From Swiss-Prot:
Catalyzed reactions: a 2'-deoxyribonucleoside 5'-diphosphate + ATP = a 2'-deoxyribonucleoside 5'-triphosphate + ADP; a ribonucleoside 5'-diphosphate + ATP = a ribonucleoside 5'-triphosphate + ADP
Claim: Cell membrane is one of the keywords in the record: no
Subunit comment: Homotetramer.
Keywords: ATP-binding, Cytoplasm, Kinase, Magnesium, Metal-binding, Nucleotide metabolism, Nucleotide-binding, Phosphoprotein, Transferase
A single cellular component GO annotation: cytoplasm
Record-listed E.C. numbers: 2.7.4.6
Name under which the protein is recorded: Nucleoside diphosphate kinase
Residues annotated as binding ATP: K9, F57, R85, T91, R102, N112
Major localization class: cytoplasm
Record-stated family: Belongs to the NDK family.
Record's keyword annotation contains Phosphoprotein: yes
Organism: Geotalea uraniireducens (strain Rf4) (Geobacter uraniireducens)
Function as written in the Swiss-Prot or TrEMBL entry: Major role in the synthesis of nucleoside triphosphates other than ATP. The ATP gamma phosphate is transferred to the NDP beta phosphate via a ping-pong mechanism, using a phosphorylated active-site intermediate.
């Protein structure tokens, strides 16, 4: 079994659709092995998105991700990373396939409901950024 990391972003939490997103996750066969609702500080968001620090959207992304609470998740499934990326859909909800989370719930490229690890290396950094081994079941 492979693990991946996911965030239900502030836009989704603000719109009270966390439960709908979780239903899609579990309905797709993912096991939630870690979950908590947190409010990131700007510094925590900057540390998490450090790989994007030179990108022009970095500051706006960190401000957005720290504006309100998020739900962080560790997910488990065969080929979890690829399966989660497929369920999320394209970054831009307008380009996402029907039935994906971003197509169903996303508002814009920034407010696209969810984040997900894009590689095993990313998951290996992202999961322990938010979860200790004791919190993963």
């Amino acid at each position: 079994m492979e693990r991946t990391f996911a965030i239900i972003k502030p836009d989704a939490v603000e719109r009270n659709i966390t439960g709908k997103v979780l239903d899609k996750i579990e309905g797709a066969g993912f096991k939630i092995v870690g979950m908590k609702k947190i409010h990131l500080t700007k510094n925590e968001a900057e540390g998490f998105y450090y790989v994007h620090k030179e990108r022009p959207f970095f500051n706006d992304l960190c401000t957005f991700m720290s504006r309100n609470p998020v739900v962080v998740l560790a997910l488990e499934k065969e080929n979890a990373i690829a399966a989660w990326r497929e369920l999320m859909g394209a970054t831009n909800p307008a380009n996402a396939e029907a039935g994906t989370i971003r197509k169903d719930f996303g508002v814009s490229i920034e407010e696209n409901t969810v984040h997900g690890s894009d590689s095993p290396e990313s998951a290996a950094f992202e999961i322990p950024y938010f979860f200790s081994q004791l919190e993963l079941v």
